[in-house]
Structures are given as structure tokens and as C-alpha cells.
């Protein structure tokens, strides 16, 4: 076996891609900071039970496991940073009011999420803790869309759903609640025959409502139809009102409502939003409310947030990150060294061509040169 081969769905990040990823990372973190989000850096490795407090069986399957040589306990390589941030909010910061946190870091998956997906993502995201109102969801949705626009993306489609609709239907019917996981699978997969089979012996109102969910999709006007076809429960009315406000705020993007798009239902407790880009089959960003996420750490606070993969964002973003630079000669000259240092202090990229390599500059566009004129070093266009 060749020593340079990497595992399947694992790849090096080469300079041009790394530069673009770093450009986008800086743009997004700067935007998060402008909203008041504080950055945290959780560890890549934790005890397994700390990493698997939420997310269900899917997160467990996606998490790499290994034995700690110091304690003998099982460790996990994180597959999602969100539970770690919840731990920080609940256990370390322990604040009483609203807390805004953001992060950017690597996550590892045992299996790729798609045919060509990487198993090593660079996850970046933002979370609000401590506010149960829709205002926090509106802010997170706006921040997610801002992030995508900063990456130069257009023709964004925002898909909205709400975990509260199915939760309300199951809460009123114990027989349906006992089949909750199977119903979730049928609804998420739009498997109408299976859904019909699972609901055949349920009460008429519950059966009609569950069978209506796969057909309640479209633009924001579908919410009016949902109010007609779903039971007049306060929880459902509140969920539909939340979706209406989220749809109304999403200016300049296409909005789609899909009340059966319940991916992540076991994780979420309220509104869920997913962003898609034309020509890209998989979601580029996901977010939503997950109020129970800190419960395992002894402090369940209201929480909402979003995340995306920077590597995938860099792949589809039109942002140009090829740096310009100043080409300088190599010489044992104090004045030259001082000129180069001054330019670098001013934020310029200065590349000194080593002897014999004056024209080998693969990654940077050297559009200027540092040349000596009348005893002084000056920058001139190339």
C-alpha cells in the first residue's frame, strides 16, 4: 500500500482551497462578532458520553470511538460541535441571561453524508442561549442568510419546518406516540403507503392530520391550508404563526414550507430552517431550535442556532481568494530588509525570490515589485 494514500472520503486541503476557506472563515466570524457573538473553542476529543447527549442514534453512528490510554475510558472524536457549545453554556459559563456563542473547527464522521462528501468537515456556526421567544430564531435565521450572502451565494432557497406540529399531534394520541419513530421515518421519507399503514387504526382526526403533512408543502400560502387541515391545537397554531414570521423576514430568498421535512426532529424542539443553493443537491446550512440540548449537562436552557461546512461552502462560493503580492529580491541589504519589514507591517504580502527561483510563484499573483531606485527601495507595478 502506498504511503501517500489517504482513507476514503478524506482529503488534504491544498493552498488555493485553504486560502479560500480561511477567507470565508474570517468573513463569517467577523460577521458573527458584529452581532455580538463570542467565540469558543471546544476540544476535538471528549469522553464519549459527553458528545452523545443529543442527536440520537445517527450521531452515535457518525462518531469515531477510541480508548483513552490514561483513563481507560472511551473517547469520541466530535462529529458535531453543537453539544460541546451547549456544555460550555450550561456548565462553564453558567450565565443567567442571553448568551451568544460562535465557533469554527474540524469535525470527523465515520461515514460520509453523501456520495462525494468529506468525512472531515470544518464546521462553523452560531448559537443563542437563554431566550425562548421567536426573536432568537429570527436573529439566527438572518445571521445564516447573511453568512451565505457574504460568501457570494445567490438564488438561495430557505426551507422551513416546525417540530412542534408533529409533537402536538403525537401528544394528543398515545397510540400514535408509541409509533413516533416509525411515523417520523415515514414522513421524512415522504413514504405515503407506509404512512397510511401506520395510521390506519388511529383516531380519525389524528389520522387525517398525519396523512395531510406530506402534502403541506409549497410557498408561505400553504400555511393557510395547514390551518384548515390540521387540528386547532394551540401548539400547532403557534408553530404555524412562527413559520409565517420566519418566512416574512426572509427577504430576497425563495421560501418553501414543508411540514413533513422532519430531518433532525429528534434533535429539534421548534422551528427548523435549511438553506439550499441552485445546482447543489445537499443542504448548505441547517439551523433551528433545540431547547433540550443542555439538559444532559444539568441546565436545559432555550437554544437556537445554525451551522454549515466551510469546505463545502468554499467549493461552491464564487469568492476569489487568490492573493496579490509584492515580489522582492533576496539580498543581504539592511535597507531592503527594512523596506520589506515595513511593507509586511502594513499588511502587504512580500515574497522574496530566493536565488535561482525568480519566476517560480505558483500561488500568488505578484502584481508589484520592490525595486531599488536612486538608493531607495520603492514599490512599482510589474
UniProtKB/Swiss-Prot annotation:
Pathway field: Amino-acid biosynthesis; L-histidine biosynthesis; L-histidine from 5-phospho-alpha-D-ribose 1-diphosphate: step 1/9
Gene3D superfamilies linked: Bira Bifunctional Protein, Domain 2
Annotated GO biological process: histidyl-tRNA aminoacylation; L-histidine biosynthetic process
Location relative to the cell: Cytoplasm
Any one GO CC term of the record: cytoplasm
Gene Ontology MF term list: histidine-tRNA ligase activity
CDD domains reported for this sequence: HisRS-like_core (cd00773)
UniProt cross-references to Pfam families, sorted A to Z: tRNA-synt_His
Source organism, top-level taxon: Bacteria
Keywords: Amino-acid biosynthesis, Cytoplasm, Histidine biosynthesis
Major location category of this protein: cytoplasm
Subunit structure as annotated in this protein's UniProt entry: Heteromultimer composed of HisG and HisZ subunits.
Family: Belongs to the class-II aminoacyl-tRNA synthetase family. HisZ subfamily.
HAMAP family: HisZ
Function: Required for the first step of histidine biosynthesis. May allow the feedback regulation of ATP phosphoribosyltransferase activity by histidine.
Other comments on record: This function is generally fulfilled by the C-terminal part of HisG, which is missing in some bacteria such as this one.
The name this protein goes by in its record: ATP phosphoribosyltransferase regulatory subunit
Annotated source species: Burkholderia multivorans (strain ATCC 17616 / 249)
Amino acid at each position: 500500500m502506498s504511503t501517500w494514500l489517504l482513507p476514503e472520503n478524506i482529503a488534504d486541503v491544498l493552498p488555493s482551497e485553504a486560502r479560500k476557506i480561511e477567507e470565508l472563515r474570517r468573513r463569517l466570524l467577523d460577521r458573527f462578532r458584529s452581532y455580538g457573538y463570542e467565540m469558543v473553542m471546544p476540544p476535538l476529543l471528549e469522553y464519549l458520553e459527553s458528545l452523545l447527549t443529543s442527536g440520537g442514534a445517527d450521531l452515535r453512528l457518525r462518531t469515531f470511538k477510541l480508548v483513552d490510554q490514561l483513563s481507560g475510558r472511551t473517547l469520541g472524536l466530535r462529529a458535531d460541535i453543537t453539544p460541546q457549545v451547549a456544555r460550555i453554556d450550561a456548565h462553564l459559563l453558567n450565565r443567567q441571561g442571553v448568551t451568544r456563542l460562535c465557533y469554527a473547527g474540524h469535525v470527523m464522521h465515520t461515514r460520509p453524508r453523501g456520495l462525494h462528501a468529506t468525512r472531515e468537515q470544518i464546521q462553523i456556526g452560531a448559537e443563542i442561549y437563554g431566550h425562548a421567544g421567536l426573536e432568537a430564531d429570527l436573529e439566527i435565521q438572518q445571521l445564516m442568510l447573511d453568512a451565505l450572502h457574504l460568501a457570494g451565494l445567490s438564488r438561495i432557497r430557505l426551507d422551513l419546518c416546525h417540530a412542534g406540529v408533529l409533537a402536538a399531534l403525537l401528544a394528543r394520541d398515545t397510540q400514535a406516540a408509541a409509533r413516533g419513530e416509525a411515523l417520523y421515518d415515514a414522513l421524512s421519507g415522504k413514504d405515503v403507503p407506509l404512512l397510511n399503514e401506520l395510521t390506519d387504526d388511529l383516531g380519525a382526526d389524528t389520522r387525517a392530520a398525519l396523512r395531510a403533512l406530506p402534502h403541506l408543502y409549497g410557498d408561505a400560502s400553504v400555511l393557510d391550508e395547514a390551518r384548515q387541515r390540521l387540528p386547532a391545537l394551540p401548539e400547532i397554531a403557534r408553530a404555524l404563526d412562527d413559520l409565517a414570521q420566519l418566512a416574512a423576514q426572509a427577504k430576497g430568498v425563495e421560501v418553501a414550507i414543508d411540514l413533513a421535512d422532519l430531518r433532525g426532529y429528534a434533535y429539534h424542539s421548534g422551528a427548523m430552517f435549511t438553506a439550499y443553493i441552485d445546482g447543489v443537491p445537499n443542504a448548505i446550512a441547517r439551523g433551528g431550535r433545540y431547547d433540550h440540548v443542555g439538559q444532559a449537562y444539568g441546565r436545559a436552557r432555550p437554544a437556537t442556532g445554525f451551522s454549515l461546512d466551510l469546505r463545502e461552502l468554499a467549493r461552491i462560493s464564487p469568492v476569489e481568494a487568490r492573493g496579490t503580492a509584492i515580489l522582492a529580491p533576496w539580498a543581504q541589504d539592511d535597507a531592503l530588509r527594512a523596506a520589506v519589514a515595513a511593507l509586511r507591517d502594513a499588511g502587504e504580502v512580500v515574497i522574496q525570490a530566493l536565488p535561482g527561483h525568480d519566476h517560480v510563484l505558483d500561488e500568488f499573483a505578484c502584481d508589484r515589485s520592490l525595486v531599488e531606485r536612486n538608493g531607495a527601495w520603492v514599490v512599482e507595478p510589474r
